[in-house]
Curated annotation (Swiss-Prot):
GO terms for biological process: DNA-templated transcription. Transmembrane segments: none annotated. It catalyses: RNA(n) + a ribonucleoside 5'-triphosphate = RNA(n+1) + diphosphate. Pfam families: RNA_pol_Rpb6. The keyword Membrane does not apply. This is DNA-directed RNA polymerase subunit omega. The keyword Transferase applies. The lineage of its organism: Bacteria, Pseudomonadati, Pseudomonadota, Gammaproteobacteria, Vibrionales. Residues 69-90 are annotated as: Disordered. Keywords: DNA-directed RNA polymerase, Nucleotidyltransferase, Transcription, Transferase. It comes from Aliivibrio fischeri (strain ATCC 700601 / ES114) (Vibrio fischeri). GO terms for cellular component: DNA-directed RNA polymerase complex.
Amino acid sequence: MARVTVQDAVEKIGNRFDLVLISSRRARQMQTGGKDALVPEENDKTTVIALREIEEGLITKELLDARERQEQQEQDAAELAAVSSITHNR
């Protein structure tokens, strides 16, 4: 198991507070959103995997925001299509 130091990840993000927010968002994505890890899992928990991804520069706040916006737009489009289908079939 590769050791992750918080300091390495803090240097990528800027401060510890943002690191907590970003790493928890990413860990939640992997746990509940079915998102795959971008680094080898090596039997690590999702929180450690998230920190490793941040440390390697694979995850940033901007990237998470963009992915979430895209997913929300796709979900909104699917819901709109479903509603449109229902109203046209009446």
